[in-house]
Amino acid sequence: MRALAFSGGKDSMACLHLMKDSLDLAIYVDTGKSYPETQRLVEYASTLVRMVIVKTDRDRQNVEQGIPSDVVPVDWTAFGQEVAGKKSVTIQGYLNCCFSNLCEPLTRKAKELGVTEIVYGQRDEEGYKSPSRNGSISDGMVRIHPIEDWTAEEVLAYLSTKMDVPAHYRIKHSSLDCYDCTAFRKDSKDRVDWTKEAHPDLYAEYLARVELLNAALKESLDCTIYTG
C-alpha cells in the first residue's frame, strides 16, 4: 500500500499531482493549529485521493512539554524543572514538538493502515530534512522522494500546470504548519509577516507566545552569562 505524507505545502501537493494515480491514500495530521488556507488545500486534495486525517492535541503536548524553540535552556525544560524548580514558562526543542505532534502520529497511522511505501515531498536543497533518502527503509516502510532533486522554482512551475497556485506557496515554509509556531525563527520571517497581514487574529496568538518565549530566554541568559 502506498501513501502520501500530505502537509498542504507545495512539495507534498506536487507529489500528489505527480503520483495520484499510484497512491492508495494520503495522510494529513491536523494539530488544531492549521491555517484556513491549509484546511482548504486538504479539502482540495481530498477530491484527488482518499484522505486520512489524524487529529493530535498540540495544545496539551505544549502544556506538558513546553513552547517550541530553536534555543533551549535546560532549566526551562519539563525535565529540567524537576531539578531546578518551576518556571513561569516551559520550553522544548522544536524537533521534539514536530516529532510528537506531526511525525510520530503520521508514522503510527501509516503502520496501522498497513502502508508499505510512503511518499514524502522532501527535497535536497531544503535546509531542514530527514536524513532518510529516496529508497530508504524506515519503520518498515520504503520512503519515496519523487521530487528529491527538484528546486522550489521547479515545484512551482510544475504546479502551475496542474492548479491555481496559492499565493502563500511562495513562502519558504509553504506548508505553513502551526500558525503560532515559535520555532524556525531564522527562516520564518516571511511566514510571520504574511500571517500578520492576512490573519491578524492568528498573528496575535503567535505574538503572545513568542513574547513569553523571548522573556524566558532572556531570563535564562541573564542567569547564565558571567560578566565578572
Regions found by a protein language model. Give the residues of each.
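ATP-dependent adenylation/nucleotidyltransferase module used to activate substrates
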Residues: 1-162
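ATP/NTP-dependent adenylation/nucleotidyl-transfer catalytic domains that generate, transfer
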Residues: 4, 160-228
